[in-house]
Amino acid sequence: MTIISIFLFYFLIYLPCHITSEIIMQFNRQYSLYEYEKFFGTNIQFFVDYFLFNKYITNIDIGEPKQKIPGFLNPAQSGFYLTAKSCPSKAFYNYENSKNYKLISKKEYGAVTVLRFSDTLHFEYSNKTSFNKTDYEFFSDKTLDNSICAIIGTKLLGNGELVEDNLLNRLHKYKSINSYYFSFDYDAKNFDQLNYIFDIDIKNNEKGYTFIKASSYSDEKRQYLVWGLDFDSLKINNSITHEKQFRAEFNINYGCIIGSSSFKETFDLILEEHNINAFVQNYNNQYDIYIFNKKEDYIKLSNFSLNFFHKSLDYNFTLDYSDLFYEVGAQIYLLILFNNKKQEFWEFGTPFLRKYHFIYNQDNKFLGFIKNDKENEFNGKTNPENNNNKTKIIFVVVLIIILIIIVTLFFGFLIGKKMYKVRKNKTNELLELYDYNSKSDNTNK
């Protein structure tokens, strides 16, 4: 009887309740963008913040014997960033410990060393696809600031293969967007297929895309794919305006906005007007300008905003203070890059992707942007539509649990009633036997 009771309790009450609690926890879990701390130390926050918005963390096994290394899979570049020995990381790839490591070539580009080597690689993607690579060529970049410690293969996922961005789909499950991708083959032969014209009829575009056309450029190390967009003006704080028409390039590799160097003069006025401190670092003929202020200077920069505008095509992108600046420790940062050697471009970092996503329509072959609303920015919150679905699912699960408990109690009542009758019959039999024995004893006497 005790064993049967334990069995019924475990399978009919405890197990359903446990499974339901796990389901509820999964739905209620806030997708934290800083879960990387279980892989990396907290000191690597700036490095992670720079890459996280269009890449996501996963694990790979590399080398023989296997070394389990956390890294960032970049769907846009079809490449993989992992921590090297030069990074302040708890785990890094050490080729000296791998029997299958083979150096193919080594080249120096200023302060950057590019290694081409082969080794054994295995990792799972989307929890459904795994890659096993041997004798595959990897590229390793070692930079002074450790911002990129290593890059594994620009064609890691195969030629022409579109790669789903799990982070975007997981956090932003819009009803009108089911399958959107933004990864492309980096073969120059296929660039003609990606030169899509801008969708002028934006007002009648029910899904709210802003489509742009592609262009490309390359350097000595690798080829990049950028998406260009022309602007009539750039408003800063709704007053200072950069009115000269310019072309901004939105680089899906690093989530950057690249524009004309003439913007630098305008931006210098902004620094002077707001009395903003700027730390300038000269690295390989490129100036990295880190603009930062202490927390008490929030009010000073609260009206800081940039607006990219095109009148005839009726589109604009606005970045305000909360989009441009992000907090690391006790400082507020805005990263601006200016190329000092050629004076050809300025570059904003990842804050753009806090407000706008790159999306790709696989059916119609369009790439574009979609804007986040305030409830759905990359802060780990889920879409309200998903919250409604979550509530419905939890409600159904709770009803199922209640039904299971009622059925369990009902069957328990029936079993208990039957056992009560059995025990009562046995008791009556014992009483009759006792009476019979008593009468027999009296007769014998």
Q: Which stretches of residues belong to each language-model region?
A:
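Cleavable N-terminal signal peptides of Sec/SRP-targeted secreted and luminal proteins
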Residues: 2-21
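Short hydrophobic beta-strand that contains or immediately precedes a catalytic carboxylate
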Residues: 60-62, 70-75, 80-82, 151, ...
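Classical protein tyrosine phosphatase
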Residues: 68, 72-100, 255-283, 413-415
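Surface-exposed or flexible loop/turn and strand-edge residues in extracellular/cell-surface modules
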Residues: 57, 112, 118, 231, ...
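Aspartyl protease catalytic domain
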Residues: 21-51, 122-242, 331-337
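Signature of the N-terminal lobe/flap region of pepsin-like aspartyl proteases
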Residues: 37-42, 51-147
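Aspartic protease catalytic domain
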Residues: 21-34, 137-144, 197-200, 243, ...
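Extended serine/threonine-enriched, polar tracts that run as long, contiguous segments within proteins
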Residues: 239-252, 256, 265-266, 305
